[in-house]
């Protein structure tokens, strides 16, 4: 079953194509990495998929339904690249925000999740009072707490320390492997994609490559964009991770 299907998607800004003729599908249970240079349209693509932006042409389906009629948003967890909505006036504590949208509260899981994101000591603080990195950890905790069927992360670890970053990626991989959660990770870090994702979409305003990471490693796209030395390091890391997993 396709969790996401995108057909011939084009989005323009000021008359210029930001993304053009994008077609791909994400099957249930896949860990997909979307990678590309700055300005390649990665975040724009995600915003079109979620209906935040309206495409100039093309079609998006979520869980088999056209985006225009899709209403099952509890199935989706999304962390945007910029947390501009969170400010000093946001009326909620960390623990309230992290549990937002949950049908059943679970104090034990809440505490464990907050501690894993190293914000357990901030549970009673207003989220708008936190630093950007602390806010980001709180929103990651919210996405993980909800256990949705689809998780979408747009550059989720930019303000995290290396240890918390590793914990986060390991948690998303565990949810993917054990729970069958479909994960989409948008990043500029091809090494992270190689370590955690099964499939890869390389975007530069249009789809340059779509397929498994293994196939990407042997493609001319990989060699052309990253060079043979980086290709060897990244692909060897991917093979080692898969054999150990």
Say what each PLM segment does.
Residues 107-124:
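Conserved ABC ATPase "signature" region
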Residues 200-213:
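H-loop (His-switch) and adjacent beta-strand-loop-beta switch element
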Residues 58-72:
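Conserved ABC transporter NBD signature motif
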Residues 126-130, 134:
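Conserved ABC ATPase signature
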Residues 214, 218-245:
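ABC ATPase nucleotide-binding domains
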Residues 50:
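Helix-to-loop junction immediately C-terminal to a conserved catalytic motif
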Residues 151-155:
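Catalytic Walker B motif of ABC-type/P-loop ATPase nucleotide-binding domains
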């Amino acid at each position: 079953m396709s969790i996401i299907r995108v057909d011939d998607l084009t989005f323009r800004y000021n008359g210029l194509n930001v993304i053009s003729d994008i077609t791909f599908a994400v099957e249930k249970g896949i860990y997909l990495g979307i990678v590309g240079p700055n300005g390649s349209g990665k975040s724009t693509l995600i915003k079109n998929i979620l209906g935040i932006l309206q495409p100039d042409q093309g079609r998006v389906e979520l869980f088999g339904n056209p985006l225009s009629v899709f209403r099952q948003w509890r199935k989706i967890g999304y962390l945007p690249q910029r947390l501009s909505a969170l400010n000093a006036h946001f009326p909620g504590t960390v623990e309230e925000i992290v549990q937002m949208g949950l049908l059943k509260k679970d104090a034990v899981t809440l505490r464990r999740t907050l501690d894993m994101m190293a914000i357990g000591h901030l549970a009673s603080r207003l989220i708008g009072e936190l630093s950007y990195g602390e806010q980001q950890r709180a929103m990651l905790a919210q996405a993980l707490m909800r256990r949705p069927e689809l998780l979408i992360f747009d550059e989720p670890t930019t303000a995290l320390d290396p240890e918390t970053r590793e914990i986060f990626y390991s948690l998303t991989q565990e949810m993917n492997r054990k729970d069958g959660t479909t994960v989409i990770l948008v990043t500029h870090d091809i090494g992270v994609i190689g370590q955690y994702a099964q499939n890869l979409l390389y975007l530069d305003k249009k789809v340059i490559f779509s397929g498994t990471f293994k196939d990407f490693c042997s493609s001319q796209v990989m060699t052309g964009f990253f060079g043979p030395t980086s290709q060897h390091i990244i692909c060897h890391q991917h093979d080692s991770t898969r054999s150990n997993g």
